[in-house]
Amino acid sequence: GTFSYFAGVEYLGHAASFHPCGDIAQIFEEVCSGQCELGVVPLENSLQGTVGVSFDLFLKHEVFIQAELFSRISHCLLSNAPTLAAVRTVYSHPQPLAQCGGWLRAHLPGAALIPVESTAAAAQRAANQPDAAAIGHGKLADMLGLGVLARRIEDEPGNWTRFVIIGPKSA
């Protein structure tokens, strides 16, 4: 349920089989080892620049870019809490927390902001806590049975990420 997952579905369709990885390094490792035919990784974000870990991993692993895609990034606040006032904790990956910082300060000034490894992991945590929320893709709500307390909470609406599809052979 990460933004990389939704970008992959957008590009490859639902006919492709997807499975979660713990982090970007694991995607590279699984593509190199043959556990996965392809991987989807973020390369650049229009607000925060290059995704340094992805560039570093290209230097360590023999993988090739098969395709690239650009995806608009819009964040939602996902929760089982009945209202914003009931939210005490917000989980997300550090980038969405930063990209929504102004909105969070304005609407949830007392909430604890907890960085986790991915937006999907954040949503899973929020699903298990009645006073918690997660920042992530709106489609995560359907996947985990969460409500959407707010949409388009990013501070800058022109947020795009360049994703690349990587594979073990040159395209």
Question: PLM features: what roles do these ranges have?
Answer:
Residues G1-A171:
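Domain-level signature for soluble enzymes in the chorismate/prephenate branch of the shikimate pathway
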